[in-house]
């Protein structure tokens, strides 16, 4: 039976401000991309999410990002590569301590937001993120976009790369994501998103906004936990994938 992992961004609340339903999402996904306090999240909230993930057997991933709480890590920052190495090491280390205190561990690393998109093509920042992961633990897989410069840099350093696809994001014909600033970048219809996920897994292709069929490789599918109706969307995706004969399990 073919398998696919489901991942979502969690732990992105801050104090009394909550973003999404982390507890409900942890009952659906197999991998949790947990914020590390730079783009979102605060210690008490991250501890709660990691504890809940550990109790449910959900893998914990360090979701590293730019130091940009005000912009939620969705703004490009022209950070010096040496500084970026240090910041990524810091974030992984912080979440690793929290995860270990809950009887779990950080199992992988996934960049967030603008950093994720930037290192698809930005060689210096891609190299910095890959170097930081290797410095912390060279056995940690990195989750990201196939064909990216980041994956090239990670592979050169001997890191395992795990490709993901986005069920609820629009794609360009070059295989990159449509900017969130553009209309229609984030999809909202749960049934359509679920069918799209099944189609991507079965065909290895995704339909771009211009109708182009773009080849895509994936071991994991991302379902965003902060979108309206996120729990319903994630549930529909999991149910449809299972009904189509796919086993839902973590990639690591």
From Swiss-Prot:
Its Enzyme Commission number? 3.5.2.9
GO molecular function terms listed in the Swiss-Prot or TrEMBL record: 5-oxoprolinase (ATP-hydrolyzing) activity; ATP binding
What Gene3D superfamilies does the database record attribute to this sequence? Answer: Glycoside hydrolase/deacetylase (3.20.20.370)
| Any GO BP annotation | carbohydrate metabolic process
Q: Which UniProt keywords apply?
A: ATP-binding, Hydrolase, Nucleotide-binding
What is the reaction catalyzed? 5-oxo-L-proline + ATP + 2 H2O = L-glutamate + ADP + phosphate + H(+)
Taken from the record, one Pfam family name reads: LamB_YcsF
Q: Which InterPro entries match?
A: Glyco_hydro/deAcase_b/a-brl, LamB/YcsF/PxpA-like
Enzyme class, spelled out: hydrolase
The text of the family note is: Belongs to the LamB/PxpA family.
Q: Subunit structure of this entry? A: Forms a complex composed of PxpA, PxpB and PxpC.
PANTHER family annotated for this entry?
Answer: 5-OXOPROLINASE SUBUNIT A, UNCHARACTERIZED PROTEIN YBGL-RELATED
Functional description taken from the UniProt entry: Catalyzes the cleavage of 5-oxoproline to form L-glutamate coupled to the hydrolysis of ATP to ADP and inorganic phosphate.
- Write down what this protein is called: 5-oxoprolinase subunit A
- Originating species: Mycobacterium marinum (strain ATCC BAA-535 / M)
Task: Specify the taxonomic lineage.
Answer: Bacteria, Bacillati, Actinomycetota, Actinomycetes, Mycobacteriales
């Amino acid at each position: 039976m073919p398998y696919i992992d489901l991942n979502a961004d969690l732990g992105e609340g801050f104090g009394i401000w909550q973003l999404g339903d982390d507890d409900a999402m942890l009952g659906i996904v197999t991998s949790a991309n947990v914020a590390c306090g730079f783009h979102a999240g605060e210690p008490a909230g991250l501890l709660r999410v990691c504890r809940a993930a550990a109790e449910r057997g959900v893998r914990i991933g360090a979701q590293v990002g730019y130091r940009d709480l005000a912009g939620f890590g969705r703004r490009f920052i022209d950070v010096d590569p040496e500084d970026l190495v240090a910041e990524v090491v810091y974030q992984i280390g912080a979440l690793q301590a929290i995860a270990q205190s809950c009887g779990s561990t950080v199992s992988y690393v996934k960049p967030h937001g603008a950093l994720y998109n930037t290192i698809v093509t930005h060689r210096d920042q891609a190299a910095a993120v890959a170097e930081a992961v290797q410095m912390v633990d060279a056995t940690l897989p990195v989750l990201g976009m196939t064909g990216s410069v980041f994956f090239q840099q990670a592979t050169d350093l001997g890191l395992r790369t795990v490709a993901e696809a986005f069920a609820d994001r629009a794609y360009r014909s070059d295989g990159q994501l449509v900017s969130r600033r553009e209309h229609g970048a984030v999809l909202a219809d749960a049934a359509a998103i679920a069918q799209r996920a099944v189609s991507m897994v079965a065909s290895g292709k995704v339909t771009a906004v211009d109708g182009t069929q773009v080849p895509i490789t994936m071991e994991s599918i991302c379902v965003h936990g902060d979108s309206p109706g996120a729990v319903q969307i994630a549930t529909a995706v999991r149910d449809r994938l299972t009904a189509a004969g796919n086993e839902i399990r973590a990639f690591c």
